[in-house]
């Protein structure tokens, strides 16, 4: 008996063998791919965690609360006490630039009942760290996620390496909130631009976030307007009532909160924007000082190097992937392009450049680097992380076609090296002295002047010159009076109230430039005002000094305050250096009808009629200016000078 195998059986056996080998090969090739996918995800998550941890440690090592941060807390104290969002009781002045920041700090202060300084420190650090997370999530989506590539931190390293970025990650100011909002907007805009199907609820959430821009900070309105313009002009998703109704709904959702607050602000405060904008006259131009401010950040850290390196890396990566940013010139094509990642990148880069030009135009600021941090963050967003795509065969399979990966690797190494250099660089070495540029390292300045490594609590600032003397002089004079700083650090000039003294005293008024440390070390019943006008409308509406220090280029003479506070206006009770004639002229100047209208807009009880009057006249109030010299103000207003010049 013989055994034989038919030809058909042989063919079937060969097919089964081939199929088995193919499946085995697929399984073997899938294992490295799965391992690489796991590695890629782990690399990205690890990069996010490492960035956040490094930033948190760096910021915590430089933790502090700035004097301007304490200004915010004075408003929060008044909110918690039921006095409203004001700096001084019975005077409606919006002394904080960021409305959202004020109410965010107030909410967590009310929720936790913790000490205000610790609340604002924790909230500021938290939103600063969240900004890094949102930035990296958005950029990861921009570059296609972790599939088949490694996403390595790049632009975020540049940001956190800068000492000013770590300084203002705490500080009590809104810097962290601004970049957190920008980072979240970036992430959601990228998601919107890449979505296969845009859902209406998520779209409305996006436009609501963008609409909050003017409440985050007035300059952020530019970013919000550009983002909303893109969304409004881009093709609409399917909506039951049609695209026109959806666009109307978008306008409503984006505008409901800022428009409602704007109406309330104009009626309540009598101004269309925060009083700080009036005090700093943000409409004025100081291009030369602005260029100094820009170089004060770019120069010492050689910041242009990582910006140039990452720009090259980003462009090379985009070109290697065949990305195009130039739409076809037709209305339909442009509208379609508006909902694309390249359009979102164009928007954030354009916003960063425009805001940089604006910061230069207004002269920058007196705080080293602070007013350029948002712009830098915007410019770094598209390269917050950069992708490294390895060849299928691993490192040994590199060919000339993989030149873009080599460029990115070189950029990462260069950025890492620069970050180590910048992180340990001290840009301003003048300590407690203010240079001719007027720019200071604010944290170092207060650390040295208070003798505290981490000035956080209000009482930490009692060791700042004049502060402890102020507290002692208020306690020693229960009848009240006007406190004016003297050249000495150990006492203040006190102008007493006129007789008879009312029961409980006439109240104290402190007139000093540093509003935060003064106001947080005295009761809310003590009126604290400043010659710059951040919390004092009369000073805010004075003319800007042509060659004054940036951010401090208004200074109202104390003669006006003697009159305004109702204190004794003759010697020997007034400080010796004050002129009785000037005080009398200031009294006459303050009788100007326009000035009186301005003052009562914030001091009259808030009735419905007062609200309507303020709402109608808010724009004219914002434009109104006085001359700080009483004699010249009398002439400007057309009043009769009590001390006319003799005829020549």
Q: Can you annotate each of these PLM segments?
A:
Residues 5-648:
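Membrane-proximal envelope and lipid/glycan-remodeling enzymes
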